[in-house]
């Protein structure tokens, strides 16, 4: 079906699996929000948060056309500077895709101090950041269409 004929958004969820159980919780929230909106979706996985922007860029070049993207993952501070690199660079790369490629992306990459904070944000019955990221993507898809980018 051609994208222009679709009434409901078609979304790609890109899920980093570095913290698998936390990622599973984020995914449940995102899927629930997309199903509630009657959006169709595909899901792919990548090793970690740094790979999410590249996966979205690859998908954008694919024959399958997505209206928007949901980025899901978790970065927990450790003892080295690696946390700052992953947190900052994954977010910056997503913003670059959003601004320069005009992609509708909901950012659900958690950047937290510890696993307890991650669970608080990942669980559907708590902060539900996976669901929030999906809702943000849907909002940006609608905004993009409002301004005439029906690509």
Swiss-Prot record:
One GO-annotated biological process of the protein: riboflavin biosynthetic process
Class of this enzyme: transferase
CDD domains: Lumazine_synthase-I
Keywords recorded for this protein, A-Z: Riboflavin biosynthesis, Transferase
EC number: 2.5.1.78
Known role: Catalyzes the formation of 6,7-dimethyl-8-ribityllumazine by condensation of 5-amino-6-(D-ribitylamino)uracil with 3,4-dihydroxy-2-butanone 4-phosphate. This is the penultimate step in the biosynthesis of riboflavin.
Family: Belongs to the DMRL synthase family.
The keyword rRNA processing is annotated on this UniProt entry: no
Active site residues of this protein: 82
Protein name: 6,7-dimethyl-8-ribityllumazine synthase
Pathway noted in the entry: Cofactor biosynthesis; riboflavin biosynthesis; riboflavin from 2-hydroxy-3-oxobutyl phosphate and 5-amino-6-(D-ribitylamino)uracil: step 1/2
Keyword Transferase set for record: yes
Binding site for (2S)-2-hydroxy-3-oxobutyl phosphate: 79-80, 121
GO terms under cellular component: cytosol; riboflavin synthase complex
Domain of life of the organism encoding this protein: Bacteria
GO MF term list: 6,7-dimethyl-8-ribityllumazine synthase activity
Residues at which 5-amino-6-(D-ribitylamino)uracil binds: 18, 49-51, 74-76, 107
Catalytic activity of the protein: (2S)-2-hydroxy-3-oxobutyl phosphate + 5-amino-6-(D-ribitylamino)uracil = 6,7-dimethyl-8-(1-D-ribityl)lumazine + phosphate + 2 H2O + H(+)
UniProt cross-references to InterPro entries, sorted A to Z: LS (IPR034964), LS/RS (IPR002180), LS/RS_sf (IPR036467)
Originating species: Bartonella tribocorum (strain CIP 105476 / IBS 506)
């Amino acid at each position: 079906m051609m994208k222009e004929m679709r009434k409901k958004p078609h979304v790609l969820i890109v899920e980093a699996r570095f913290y698998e159980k936390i990622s599973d919780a984020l995914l449940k929230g995102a899927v629930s929000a997309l199903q509630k909106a009657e959006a169709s979706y595909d899901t792919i996985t990548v090793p970690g948060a740094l790979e999410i922007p590249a996966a979205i860029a690859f998908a954008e070049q694919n024959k399958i056309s997505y209206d928007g993207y949901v980025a899901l993952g978790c970065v927990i501070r450790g003892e080295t500077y690696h946390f700052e690199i992953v947190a900052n660079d994954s977010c910056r790369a997503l913003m670059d895709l959003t601004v320069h490629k005009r992609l509708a992306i909901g950012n659900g990459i958690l950047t937290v101090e510890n696993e307890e904070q991650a669970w608080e944000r990942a669980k559907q019955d708590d902060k539900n950041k996976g669901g929030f990221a999906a809702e943000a993507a849907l909002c940006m898809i609608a905004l993009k269409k409002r301004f005439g980018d029906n690509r």
